Amino acid sequence: MTVTIYDVAREARVSMATVSRVVNGNQNVKAETKNKVNEVIKRLNYRPNAVARGLASKKTTTVGVIIPDISNIYYSQLARGLEDIAIMYKYHSIISNSDNDPEKEKEIFNNLLSKQVDGIIFLGGTITEEMKELINQSSVPVVVSGTNGKDAHIASVNIDFTEAAKEITGKLIEKGAKSFALVGGEHSKKAQEDVLAGLTEVLNKNSLQLGDTLNCSGAESYKEGVKAFAKMKGNLPDAILCISDEEAIGIMHSAMDAGIKVPEELQIISFNNTRLVEMVRPQLSSVIQPLYDIGAVGMRLLTKYMNDEKIEEPNVVLPHRIEYRGTTK
């Protein structure tokens, strides 16, 4: 049978209001009474309901997390950083997978609000205009981390994809690349746009032109990388920039199966740097996004909003670095 606040109050011979004050950390309780109530709570194994506690404290110490797919290695690293900081600040997380479905995202968002969460963090994927409107109208703070399609009015944490693309393109040109292609997916359109901006800026400065810009029809997966290579096979560039590691590996394996030498004849670089990049041969060159930190900093930013702390910068840009491994010269 579930132990209730009434059971604790009866056993400790105090009012339910006193038990509530002890549970919520109210200082206006005598030490002797507090110790007695805590002893009964421990003995009866009473677990306060977060929403019930929230009625007294106006907080549930619960945050909602909207994530495209936690089984994806990219998103799981973001989620781990978030969760560690949430625990550090005594918050519990309700994690919901949206599957990059805009309708499902809206449903999850409204469901989390109905659960009286103290804040919501949106991890990865792309924010639609409709979702931006929901966020701007939200009754609780919302932070987006590692998410494409950011808005200046929405608190966010990410890297600068445009600057990363400019660095990569310049380096590959130095190594002899004269023709380039960009491969991304429909769920990373904004990141792809930012990469494209940096790529074309450097190409224009060097009087070079961009070849293919391919949007994969589905998620940024190995299979989509294989399909992308098939489309480019008759007119391969010197270098391919891929938004995801899985796409890049699909392209690399397809190229090698076709007898094309990587990186001598085709250079490949990605923007995720998940654990996969070191599990393939040659190892994949990649932009190192501090995925754990992006999740962690996003959660810390959310705790500041939830606790009315001073916010120095609502749109945080974390540093990146580029690891040139075996798929580039």
Swiss-Prot record:
Keywords: Activator, DNA-binding, Repressor, Transcription, Transcription regulation
GO molecular function, a single term: DNA-binding transcription factor activity
Domain HTH lacI-type: 1-57
DNA-binding region, residue intervals: 5-24
Function: Global transcriptional regulator of carbon catabolite repression (CCR) and carbon catabolite activation (CCA), which ensures optimal energy usage under diverse conditions.
Protein name: Catabolite control protein A
Source organism: Staphylococcus aureus (strain MRSA252)
Gene of this entry: ccpA
